[in-house]
Swiss-Prot record:
Keyword Cell membrane recorded: no
Source species, domain of life: Eukaryota
InterPro entries in the record: FN3_dom, FN3_sf, Ig-like_fold
Annotated TM spans: 113-133
Record's bilayer topology term: Single-pass membrane protein
Main location per the UniProt record: membrane
Keyword vocabulary terms for this entry: Membrane, Transmembrane, Transmembrane helix
Domain Fibronectin type-III: 1-101
GO cellular component, one term: membrane
Organism: Mus musculus
Protein name per its UniProtKB record: Fibronectin type III domain-containing protein 9
Amino acid sequence: MNIEVGNVSHTGAIISWSPSEPCLEDYYHIMYRPNWNSIFSGYLRYNFHHEEKVPRTITSVALEHLAPSTLYFLCISCKKAAFPYSHYCTMFHTLDKSPLAAGGSLVDPQISLWVLMAILLACFTAVLAFICLQFWCLRCHEPRWSYRAGQMEEANGLVRWPEETPALGQREEDLQGFPLEELPRKNSGARAKAEPEAEAIQDALEVVALAREIGNQPAILPHYRE
């Protein structure tokens, strides 16, 4: 059976069909319901909200009092010789009450949903590409350091430390080369007087040792009065 839907408006439609086999009953069963929850819920008669009986001599019917901008699920059944009941189904969409519907412009809700999903996916892709571009720009502008001939210079030549500038380890070695002097401590007066005498004796011993090495003059010890 070939079912055709024509003259669809926001509250009605005309359904016509051409039977391929004769109907054994006296009438056709025209069943339809709004398809709000599911596209297909079975061919059982109690699933349909509306049912009309049309004599088998009539091959078209006008449906009225339909909801605007609603998808309808329609089936036509008739008892035949081969099967107890044969169901032939189709779907149609009523028009909207807006002025665009009067001019013949109809937008499928499923198409609108796909368009909305495509727009959201494009926005997400654009944001992700922008974040990746910003990260790549930051990586490109990072300073790249290179060490050449004892000096550290930036790859683009903006910052440079010449060779004459001593490094940190060299400065520590220079500081280690300086002699260390012991700071005077606060001692008693007797120890302060003994220090010049000890220095004088040390000087005398150095003079004697120097004279022995030369060998030209006899060693003469200096005499200090007590």
